[in-house]
Amino acid sequence: MFEIKKICCIGAGYVGGPTCSVIAHMRPEIRVTVVDVNESRINAWNSPTLPIYEPGLKEVVESCRGKNLFFSTNIDDAIKEADLVFISVNTPTKTYGMGKGRAADLKYIEACARRIVQNSNGYKIVTEKSTVPVRAAESIRRIFDANTKPNLNLQVLSNPEFLAEGTAIKDLKNPDRVLIGGDETPEGQRAVQALCAVYEHWVPREKILTTNTWSSELSKLAANAFLAQRISSINSISALCEATGADVEEVATAIGMDQRIGNKFLKASVGFGGSCFQKDVLNLVYLCEALNLPEVARYWQQVIDMNDYQRRRFASRIIDSLFNTVTDKKIAILGFAFKKDTGDTRESSSIYISKYLMDEGAHLHIYDPKVPREQIVVDLSHPGVSEDDQVSRLVTISKDPYEACDGAHAVVICTEWDMFKELDYERIHKKMLKPAFIFDGRRVLDGLHNELQTIGFQIETIGKKVSSKRIPYAPSGEIPKFSLQDPPNKKPKV
């Protein structure tokens, strides 16, 4: 059997960096080189301050960096030396042309394929790590076949990642499954078994699933679509709970105890974010439309529509509760990452909520423990989010949560950071304008509602009526509409 001794990973982002760091950590006899065209990112991987935050990542990197784990911008040499090349580059949603807003843009995948074939000789395994549409491996293989050389043998596999940001290291060390797809030919199966051997040193063999390439590619899209669907489903129930007096947490517990349903991903919130869910569901929608399956496409589109609705509904609730206007009012936004234990802001609900409130003239004071100021400014300065001077006029980045809440009309919790449960809310209430509102978009304060009401807060949360003496207001009856799907037409201001 072919033995993999050297691995090259093209792409040092949220997938490539942690994945290959764990492989190097678990397989010290394999030399792992992570390469990227972004020199500043590679410099960060080689520094004490890593470019991404992930619990446990720093310890893993430091245990093997400089020994059998290397980060470099020398892409060509790393490809030439490798037995296995992971393609772990971005596959963003297209922002222009056919499939705009839904189809995956595979330009980086294609560029990798061309660079790999240019720098390869002999036998090499090329593996998709990036989330790609079905039959992307076929496109890679066609590029290889069109640029073949004597004695060149490139085998293409699919090995999608199933890690979740915030628990990536745990997921990589103890995965639910490892999925490897390859050609159903002797050469293809030889490559599959070689990659299986890499994982078998720490992953039980029964957790390593082998399929054909197309099943592997579709399984990744389907997995993310099912998870997103669960969140949209419970969020739809949260709207019903708010209208009837039910508590969505109690409903979720009741249905989650049914073993046929299970209790995971039944946490109602202001909406899902991150780099994968929306992108992959929209990719699935586009695939269904391209295959003339309009009913299937509409079914999955509703998952995205419900997520957008949940965000608009939450923003409308903030505005309505504050006497139908937030113009010139200070609003504290606690949390900007799309979930706790990560600094990733891609498709974060905080961006959308901030957009709605800025459009109404609110002054936002934003705090997040792991998202840099520059990233928040870039996200909110996107042409699809704000006008040229909106961010400079309406947004302040605070150094701590108390500064953000000082003098605020309302506190809006958008990320479920554990630290928000431990804040001194009496101190916060004293410094806020009265009536003081808390809008808990992540249900992180569920156990504190009585205490917070005793302090004097008006509490609004997802999927539950809390405040017994709610301040009367005149509802606008209007839920704002907004999309980040429009293509950028200018560079964001920092």
UniProtKB/Swiss-Prot annotation:
Pathway: Nucleotide-sugar biosynthesis; UDP-alpha-D-glucuronate biosynthesis; UDP-alpha-D-glucuronate from UDP-alpha-D-glucose: step 1/1. UDP-alpha-D-xylose (UDX) acts as a feedback inhibitor. It binds at the same site as the substrate, but functions as allosteric inhibitor by triggering a conformation change that disrupts the active hexameric ring structure and gives rise to an inactive, horseshoe-shaped hexamer. Residues 321-325 are annotated as: Important for formation of active hexamer structure. NAD(+) binds at residues 11-16, 36, 41, 89-93, 130-132, 165, 276-279, 346. It comes from the Eukaryota. InterPro entries: 6-PGluconate_DH-like_C_sf (IPR008927), NAD(P)-bd_dom_sf (IPR036291), UDP-Glc/GDP-Man (IPR017476), UDP-Glc/GDP-Man_DH_C (IPR014027), UDP-Glc/GDP-Man_DH_C_sf (IPR036220), UDP-Glc/GDP-Man_DH_dimer (IPR014026), UDP-Glc/GDP-Man_DH_N (IPR001732), UDPglc_DH_euk (IPR028356). It catalyses: UDP-alpha-D-glucose + 2 NAD(+) + H2O = UDP-alpha-D-glucuronate + 2 NADH + 3 H(+). The modification N6-acetyllysine is found at residue 107. Keywords: Acetylation, Allosteric enzyme, Carbohydrate metabolism, NAD, Oxidoreductase, Phosphoprotein. The protein goes through several conformation states during the reaction cycle, giving rise to hysteresis. In the initial state, the ligand-free protein is in an inactive conformation (E*). Substrate binding triggers a change to the active conformation (E). UDP-xylose binding triggers the transition to a distinct, inhibited conformation. The presence of an intrinsically disordered C-terminus promotes a more dynamic protein structure and favors a conformation with high affinity for UPD-xylose. The allosteric switch region moves by about 5 Angstroms when UDP-xylose is bound, and occupies part of the UDP-glucose binding site. At the same time it promotes domain movements that disrupt the active hexameric ring structure and lead to the formation of a horseshoe-shaped, inactive hexamer. This is UDP-glucose 6-dehydrogenase. The lineage of its organism: Eukaryota, Metazoa, Chordata, Craniata, Vertebrata.
